[in-house]
């Protein structure tokens, strides 16, 4: 499938993504393979448009642990904002997939107080789902108690039919049984 830049003249090339989610033709992103450019300004790549987000998702997986740490340190204060961004949330999912326990704990602590709101958000829900899949069962159980109490205060029966929240609830159920 070919992803086109957004209507405002994307600064990124049109890139061809294969079904596995990675960039098919590495030449399509040759000018953006400068690691220093990516490491120095990851937010530019993440927030501009779909192509920028796809570029950083693909390249992040190829970086060294030190380079990944540099990017993480530049964006960690924006985790909440990026998790709800229509393009950047996909990178936050990749970040969680590629992270060690320390980074996952940081992301968890950044999002845990707003878990319910993120679970209802059409972009944030992907981040919460991936995060729940990475957390230890003990943390999931503690989080479930807080989440459940919050749900009961927010008309849980009505909100449980929300498609995004429902996906999060399914992960909770799988993880705590």
Which stretches of residues belong to each language-model region?
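Eukaryotic gene-expression regulator signature that favors modular helical reader/repeat domains
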Residues: 1-177
